[in-house]
């Protein structure tokens, strides 16, 4: 009986640990983030997932880039004070070109919608 009880306790502990890790994994993936995909001297590629009301931090782009939209929506390009500089409307399945940013200008990307926006960014380095 003791062996069965020990196995049951071990199984319960393992399941509880797995559930906790699963919840942690879900919390991690529900954050706005960039996921590197590929990089060399010519190009840098990443996936951006922009959750509602979780802006990407201030940054700039020194090179032009193609945006391939996996999940579309409206994206506000905001300044350091969170003031909207422009709004981009991206349709799922479409691709868009964005020029490099003006010298010295930084921006954040803010999704004010209800669903995540997901894009692949292909930044040309030459």
Protein language model annotation of sequence segments:
Residues 61-81:
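Glycine- and acidic-residue-biased ligand/ion/polar-headgroup-sensing regions
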Residues 24-28:
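Boundary of Sec targeting at the N-terminus
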Residues 53-57, 93-109:
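Histidine-centered metal-chelating micro-motifs
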Residues 101-125:
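Ligand-binding loop in jelly-roll beta-barrel domains
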Residues 39-42, 83-101:
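Short acidic-glycine-tyrosine-enriched beta hairpin
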Residues 1-10:
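Bacterial N-terminal signal peptides that target proteins for export
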Residues 32-57, 62-68, 120-122:
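A short glycine-rich, His/Asp/Glu-containing loop-to-beta-strand
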Residues 10-22:
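Bacterial N-terminal signal peptides
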């Amino acid at each position: 009986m003791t062996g069965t009880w020990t196995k049951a306790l071990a199984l319960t502990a393992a399941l509880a640990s797995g559930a906790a890790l699963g919840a942690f994994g879900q919390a991690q993936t529900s954050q706005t983030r960039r996921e590197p995909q590929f990089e060399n001297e010519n190009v840098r590629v990443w996936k951006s997932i922009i959750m509602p009301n979780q802006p990407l931090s201030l940054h700039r782009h020194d090179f032009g880039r193609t945006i391939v939209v996996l999940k579309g929506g409206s994206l506000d390009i905001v300044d350091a004070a969170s003031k909207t500089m422009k709004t981009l409307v991206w349709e799922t399945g479409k691709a868009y070109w964005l020029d490099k940013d003006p010298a010295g200008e930084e921006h954040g990307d803010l999704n004010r919608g209800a669903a995540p926006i997901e894009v692949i960014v292909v930044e040309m380095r030459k």
